[in-house]
């Protein structure tokens, strides 16, 4: 069956998908992961797959470094330097310099630390500014943390339409908190243009890279960004609950060094000399002040395994080649779904234009939860995100209020045949109304 549109260079059959996967210069990277043969895994935007070497590395850390080295391994195995060493590996993926990224804590805590630091800087420079700006539909933890920071600092959190975020800048806005790629729609903001507009308006910007780091090129330095955070368990494949990372522009850390400024969670490993056990806090220099608690060594070892796969990708074209494959997979899947599932209740929510789309495709469906559960039962794993309650009188916006099916494309291991098979199963689930089976109606704690 021919499904690609006239003039399309995308595959027209499953056999063509198989051939395209065989010719893929990145195909060897899939061998770096454990992906069950009976599963089409399109949820790397929520939890990355397990790298092949992670289990052995964790066993090595547990048995040799912990079991034999015991507490000596803080020095002999370099545990104490993990936040900086692994941070440098992330820096290479996000346009940051060596020594500018620390791996620490969770994304939520790092949002709190960076947003608080940005607010503190602005309260010194422009104390009349009282607004923290973000977009409607931003990931909830970012908004919850922003509410807390606003309440603690006497500020106000203001939400604006993400499509027109730069139009919301006024002389009241102190800081913009924005996720680079929206978790629901997959819409990608222009980081350089948005940061430039913020600076022109006198605001600082905190970027959340949870849905972009490891999936597409990010250039924090080139964009002249102020602060950034991100998680380790999505496209970086660090495992469930992997540590997060934090970055601050060197101009801000230099100023914080000069003025002995602290971020609000001044834990002992963010101290300039933690093993002096001094009774008063003295912040470490640079990004190290943003470390709070003791590094979770096993979790960091797992994250490092995920990051090391990107080193294997470098001779194959690196992040640019991964992005090109991601775009092709997304374009192909959208075309397949819209061709096969026309009239079956799906509505594309992600941008059709790949230039403003991250590495996922989201579709709204009134029975989205049931549809996704039926797909998972057939071995196609994506995920579901419930729509927000629509304010009375507000126009419908499926990117905000639609129940969404999300499909993530991780070019390190996702194949074109996976996109084909997923679209085929999605059509069958919808056309047969298999999703109406009562077993698919029960909501789980994790969606």
Residue ranges: model-predicted function:
Residues 1-447:
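Pyridoxal 5′-phosphate
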